[in-house]
From Swiss-Prot:
Belongs to the universal ribosomal protein uS3 family. The keyword Disulfide bond does not apply. Disulfide bonds: none annotated. Keywords: Ribonucleoprotein, Ribosomal protein, RNA-binding, rRNA-binding. GO terms for biological process: translation. Gene3D superfamilies: 3.30.300.20, Ribosomal protein S3, C-terminal domain. Residues 38-106 form the KH type-2 domain. The lineage of its organism: Bacteria, Pseudomonadati, Thermodesulfobacteriota, Desulfobacteria, Desulfobacterales. Part of the 30S ribosomal subunit. Forms a tight complex with proteins S10 and S14. This is Small ribosomal subunit protein uS3. Pfam families: KH_2 (PF07650), Ribosomal_S3_C (PF00189). It comes from Desulforapulum autotrophicum (strain ATCC 43914 / DSM 3382 / VKM B-1955 / HRM2).
Length: 215
């Protein structure tokens, strides 16, 4: 089971939490679609800021958007000018009052989504996939990851037949629910077709003592 399922979904409410946090009755489908539109808009507009994930919380009359970025300065701008423009653009898309929080990712080398997107960018620049994967693996281990696994699937190197290649270093305990396993996925759009990239990064175990849970 642990080998097939999304590691974040498997650990929800154990060591991971939801990216969208709100309750809805009859407006559920509208809110889901609104969240999808917001994430797609922000990922496209703030691509150069290195966006890892976007959390959305809804209250009665306002919505809080928390953006996790490797380069928060690009989003905020000089004296907050860029973030003010961004807030206006979002308020034209949705009705509630918008609050935007920017969280800096201090070590993007061990953020699974950013590692996957970095490999994707290298493949689109025609860098050899093995070199890109090995570089990311060694960089993650150097910055404190306890284990990393990268899987690339598709017409690798322009081959006629699609195949899957992977590199792994350290350990990735996919069945251990207390293990903090980060997961990222993206696609590289190459001239030969799309190449899927999955990244698993093990950052250590979240023990009961750390979460203040009494036995």
């Amino acid at each position: 089971m642990g080998q097939k399922v999304n590691p974040i979904g498997l650990r929800l409410n154990i060591v991971k939490t939801w990216d969208s946090r709100w309750y809805a009755d009859k407006n559920y489908a509208d809110f889901v679609f609104e969240d999808y539109k917001l994430r797609a808009f922000l990922k496209k507009k703030l691509f150069h800021a290195g966006i890892s994930k976007i959390e959305i919380e809804r209250f009665t009359k306002r919505i809080r958007i928390r953006v996790f970025a490797a380069r928060p300065g690009i989003i905020i701008g000089k004296k907050g000018s860029e973030i003010a423009l961004l807030k206006k653009e979002i308020e034209q898309m949705i009705t509630p009052e918008v609050l935007i929080d920017i969280q800096e990712i201090r070590r993007p080398e061990i953020d699974a989504q950013l590692v996957a997107e970095n490999i994707s960018a290298q493949l689109e620049r025609r860098i050899a996939f093995r070199r890109a994967m090995k570089r990311s693996v060694s960089s993650a281990m150097r910055f404190g990851a306890q284990g990393i696994k990268i899987i690339c699937s598709g017409r690798l190197g322009g081959a006629e037949m699609a195949r899957t290649e992977w590199y792994k270093e350290g350990r990735i305990p996919l069945h251990t629910l207390r293990a903090d396993v980060d997961y990222g996925f993206t696609e590289a759009k190459t001239t030969y077709g799309a190449i899927g990239i999955k990244t698993f990064i093990f950052k250590g175990e979240v023990l009961k003592a750390d979460r203040n849970v009494k036995a």
